[in-house]
């Protein structure tokens, strides 16, 4: 049997880029909670002892941006300079302007257009992907890397591994076989974890705790064998982390946010963007379409692309590829997709309830992936039953 290796990485919520994603989405939540028509394009950057929030926001909401920044940093665990950032004492800069009136008139007519008339907030192309290799209909390499990162945070916050600090990265290499276009995981080839830690812990203790409390609870035993390679803090020392170790910026972890390198990506980031930004809403609807195709038995693996022009409601193109795993021709599946999904931005906002903020709704998406999550707030993960007739043998 011919096999190949494929690798996906993740970072946890204390990584400086992910910190920025979470602040941007916390701002979005605050705006949408008070004003569902808020137009938000919120960027965040961070470095030692500094967080800056900047962008274009038009909203009736009363938002305390500095409080959102400090609360988000504190909740992640950035509570002192020792761990990379002190939420209560760092410098917070806010540079927010209104949305460009040129964009406003072209996209939503200064809030006068009906939902079906609202145009895309920008040009672009987005991809959705699904595969039957996991219950989440997501790639196993990505699922495992993401869950390892989430588990790192869990054992840090519950005190199981008190030596952990907020920043950390994970990476998983899976050996696969190709079953006529479908991906079949065989085993985990390599597990890599680099996690920030305090001064007191030894490398041996780090390796032992990571295997016992992070890897074993996350990776099913059937995928591990005596040949699985473990690289656990291979650099030997990771005390300085968070914004103290590296600068952070919103939108720099777009592959981690999506499919771990599988499928494709149009390049647009998600966090800090309201649903008129099709970078986000378009990617959500095509994930729902791809997932529904696989869940309905139309294919074992699928990618869906949609594209837009700024100010134009209807998509320019919709594309489906099932990698040869489709039960009926891809052109027939494309027809089913177009009949069942409304790709107009205003209608996507309604059908996926994307104007509802608050309660950490979008903040939750900003760490540990936007897809494959079992959470009712992730409305794009709800499978739409697709009716089709199996061809006669």
From Swiss-Prot:
Highest taxon of source: Eukaryota
Pfam families: S-AdoMet_synt_C, S-AdoMet_synt_M, S-AdoMet_synt_N
GO cellular component, one term: cytosol
Amino-acid positions noted as binding K(+) in the UniProt annotation, renumbered to this chain: 43
Cofactor binding note: Binds 2 divalent ions per subunit. The metal ions interact primarily with the substrate. Can utilize magnesium, manganese or cobalt (in vitro). Binds 1 potassium ion per subunit. The potassium ion interacts primarily with the substrate.
The keyword Nucleotide-binding appears for this protein: yes
EC number of the protein: 2.5.1.6
Residues at which L-methionine binds: 56, 99, 246, 277
Residues binding ATP, per UniProt: 15, 167-169, 235-238, 246, 252-253, 269, 273, 277
Summary of the function given for this chain in its UniProt record: Catalyzes the formation of S-adenosylmethionine from methionine and ATP. The reaction comprises two steps that are both catalyzed by the same enzyme: formation of S-adenosylmethionine (AdoMet) and triphosphate, and subsequent hydrolysis of the triphosphate.
PANTHER family: S-ADENOSYLMETHIONINE SYNTHETASE
Protein name: S-adenosylmethionine synthase 1
Organism for this UniProt entry: Solanum lycopersicum (Tomato)
